[in-house]
Amino acid sequence: MAIVIIVCAVPEGLPLMISLVLMQNTSKMLDHNVLVRKAEGIETAGSLNILFSDKTGTITKGMLEVVEFFMPNGDTIPIDNLGLHSKVKALLDISIGKNTASMFDANHKVIGGNATDQALMKFIGEETYNVLTNESEYSVTNSQGFNSSNKFSQVEIKELGKTFYKGAPEKFLSIATKALDEDGNEVELNFDEINEKINTLASRAMRVLAFGYSNSSMTENAINDDVVLIGFVAIRDDVRPEAKMAIKEVMDAGIQVVMITGDRLETAVSIAEDAGLIQNQSDKALTSTELNSLSDDEIKSMIKDIRVIARALPTDKSRMVRICQEMNLVVGMTGDGVNDSPALKRADVGFAMGSGTEAAKEAGKIVVLDDNFRSIKDAILYGRTIYHNILKFCKFQLVINVAAVVVSAIAPFFGVDEPLKVTHLLFVNLVMDGLGAIMLGNEPAKEKYMEEAPRRRDESIVSKKMMAQILTMGAWLVVISFAFLKLPFFDQFFNTEEQKLTAYFVLFILSALFNGFNVRDERFAIFSGLNENTGFLKVFFVIIAVQACIVNAGLVNLDIFKWIGEMFSCVPFGITGWVVVIILGFTMIPVDIVRKLIFNK
């Protein structure tokens, strides 16, 4: 008996519970466009303190559109009128059509490349693309793709004797001295006019790209000194409406959100303001250059105020993850490129984008299939749901275990040798553990979990409130146990001592089942959401039905049923006795309501 008591003190169902919770919630998350690659990722997501998020396609729609073309002197040429400036358009078309990773397919759709490439390809159109592709004079002889370090791409076309460029305006403006006018003639570049125009567009959340050409051969990792600016395009990418709300919910959950983008600072700040990331003057936006000029200690002192990192490099992501982890923060990081893989792998939770590279997906613990910040918020919510469901099971099972151990250990001192038989304790330990996991493992996600502060890394799973609930309800179950067993009042409902001990076995199980309602909510909504967790009531009534069969097995005149009754030391008792034990078991609910009123003030 002592060994059985020790076994009952341990919640063996906890590993099963954790497995069920993870399995059930990860399958639900697929409906929210979240694929969990590593189970620990979703659990950790519920503990995030800081989240570094990409901009394009995650916070913004990722549906880029060229909305304006302007000359190096700052004058805008309406897109429909660009054909009137044939020299400018011809050079611009080559700089785009031969210098992007996108193309038109057989179905006349733009494929390949990133969102920026696709927006530019749509801008020049399929007819222009076909001309550039089919005519030999436009054959590329040398090329270098865009990367986050250079911030430009280039192609050399020897037939034309030129190298064409596409990239960040500042890369050109630091070198160029010449530019085209509207007639395609080379003129002196006016820096004041163009900088004012770029800054104005950037402040309106527009991304600006520059285009140029050189009459020299291509130089690896460099723009030639004789580069001539052709012009600039402004690209718009609006903030997702649902992302704005999701960012607010994540920030209200106590999670700091930092937007990391390759855009220039003014554009990034404008997007961050639209998305609700920057709300007051204390919120900081830094460029990669400014970030790298700061020491780790300086960054740590201001980390709580950082909202934007512009012109960011992949190395900036890895550094920020390391610094935050040194501060004992739980870090989330998004990424989609090969260069993002180290940061995704190093972060506590790496969110790889569904449209990203296989290397990024392999490095991340979670794949966001639709690249949407809203889905990241859902992942955080389900992470917190998993944690809460595990806590619910622990409270449910520990009350049973505490009461079973205490009653079995001290009952002999009160003249009751074996209130719970060995088979009763095994039923409590095995059946209630396993089915309890099913009851509580599928509890629905509640938006109120997003109102809680993130958990600390070193935070104990058993809080003071949780311990108070376990001890209070365990103590009450012990009280009604001894009241039922020792008070003469209850003898009148049973004919024999065997019937009373059988009824006590039923009372113990019913009390545990009613306590299952108590642990569903820390406040008073203990019956809400049952339609979303149909398994709870199914298990509730299945256990009652199984107990009724065990208790009344002796009524069936077959050896197997008599054996079941004898094995569990159970004999049938009357309907009045059933009403009594149901009422006593139900008292677990009002007693816990009183406890909540006292402790939750």
Where do the model's predicted regions map?
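Conserved cytosolic headpiece of P-type ATPases
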Residues: 1-454, 459-462, 505, 522-601
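Alpha-helix capping/termination and helix-coil
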Residues: 328, 380, 479-491, 508-521, ...
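Core segments of transmembrane alpha-helices
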Residues: 400-404, 469-481, 542
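Helix-coil boundary and interhelical linker segments in multi-pass alpha-helical membrane proteins
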Residues: 412-421, 485-500
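Generic alpha-helical transmembrane segments
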Residues: 432, 437, 477-478, 501-516
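Membrane-water interface at loop-to-transmembrane-helix junctions
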Residues: 454-476, 496-503
